[in-house]
Amino acid sequence: MNELTLIDFYLCFLAFLLFLVLIMLLIFWFSLEIQDIEEPCNKV
């Protein structure tokens, strides 16, 4: 039982880390999009 609970805890921890990374990537992409919108369109 201890091994199963350890594996479950490890999987939950990995899922939590993946969730945090996804949120950070979304915030980073969103900030880049806002900067592109605020700046005048020089890239044509």
Curated annotation (Swiss-Prot):
Keyword Plastid set for record: no
Cystine bridges: none
Extent of the signal sequence: none
CC terms in the record's Gene Ontology section: host cell membrane; membrane
Subcellular localization(s) per the UniProt record: Host membrane
Species whose genome carries this gene: Bat coronavirus HKU3
Keyword list, A-Z: Host membrane, Membrane, Transmembrane, Transmembrane helix
Additional free-text comment from the UniProt record: Bat coronavirus HKU3 is highly similar to SARS-CoV (SARS-like).
Transmembrane segments: 9-29
Domain of life: Viruses
Membrane topology value: Single-pass membrane protein
InterPro entries: NS7B_bCoV, ORF7b_SARS-CoV-like
Name this polypeptide is given: Non-structural protein 7b
Chief place where the protein resides: host cell
